[in-house]
Amino acid sequence: GAVKALYMITGAPPLVPRFALGNWWSRYYAYTQDGYLRLLQRFEDRKIPLTVATLDMDWHWSKTLDEVKKITELGRNTEFYGGNNGWTGYSWNTDLFPDYKKLLRDIKEKGCKITLNLHPADGVRWFENQYNDMANALGKDSSTGERIAFDIADDDFINAYFKILHKPYEKDGVDFWWIDWQQGEKSDLDGLDPLWSLNHYHY
């Protein structure tokens, strides 16, 4: 009675997909492309079914970010440019994953859904593959190299965030995003929790 009436007003609650109830592989480790596939093969050889393959933050430039992008060497380890913190990233680490599209296809062939770790709090920095497109979408001058701030309260940012940073990777084979906590509890909109908002928009 009461619950049915509530659903008539609110609609039925979404159900988690069946694959989410299976076995996930998740480990904070800097896998290589071949190494990750060998790992999945070991599970398959032992007849241990996996439904979700997780790649932690080393899918993008992380531990070697400063060295590879020469951030400090170029004098760009400043707040203006976004520093050299490796938590946030959107460009694949090609040292570890030289052909990420093939990696995603190979994982799919093993029957796994794919999720990538995400820490968006540092925004989009000058060295990211998507920086120019993000700057253009938000009316910013990309020639300055200024960090594009993460702003979950701004509609234009949210639209560009999904269209430019995430949807292309989803077309390549990423199924969903593991939103790791890093954004704090406040945004430019009073009372809006960034993590709650990210969960809402991504879901």
Regions found by a protein language model. Give the residues of each.
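Catalytic-domain carbohydrate-binding cleft regions of carbohydrate-active enzymes
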Residues: 1-203
